[in-house]
Amino acid sequence: MSVFHLALNAHILIGTVVLVSFWTAALAAKGSTLHRRGGKTYVIAMAGLLAVTLVTAVGMVLDGDPRRAMFNVYVTLTSVVSVWMAWSSVAWRHDIRRYLGWPYKLLFGALAGYGLFVLSLAPRMPQPARVAMVTAFAVLGLSIAAAMAWRLWKRDDSPRWWLAEHLTAMAINFAATHASFSILAGSSVLEALKDPWMRTAVLVAWMISALGLRLWAGRRFLSPKAAARATTLGAARAGAAG
């Protein structure tokens, strides 16, 4: 079995852990022990998954497909950015300067530059379906970079800026986790998911779903009423702990 296929099988296996931990954190009460443990498991599993993805890229190069490997690295970068944002926005929620430090700026610059490069490659793809897929991924990365630029400009424009960042990152992770699992694991069962147009449709569907999820989460958790509830709950927990 080639390096590529070994890494692909590992990707599907770890991806299952990623999917389960994502929904464990998503469905748990926010801020609860289960929520935090699910989130921690998700970050650790994603770190392993992204490492495997880079091995997959090496396998692609060894199989004589460097263009696909380069694209694979770009997809990995978008996930690295979103996982970093999801973790660091909570870890440094009281320190916007640390959150927007050099790692954030480095990831922003890398994603913006790589996204523009990938977008420039789209018209050169040999098939219309691949043009559409590469364009969709480029737009995804550039949209994330635009959100990062907005945060660099606005900084801590509200007391719950960190939650806005966390929700944005988790919406991106939602799309990445489910699109990857649908395409990679699904294509091993359904032959239709190997078709480039079908894969593009799946990707775009999850991207649109992620946008809808982020808009809903913003209304659910960032409204003045939600902030008041969080303050009351925090005070109650502090009182119970005291």
Predicted features by range, described:
Residues M1-G242:
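Alpha-helical membrane insertion/targeting regions
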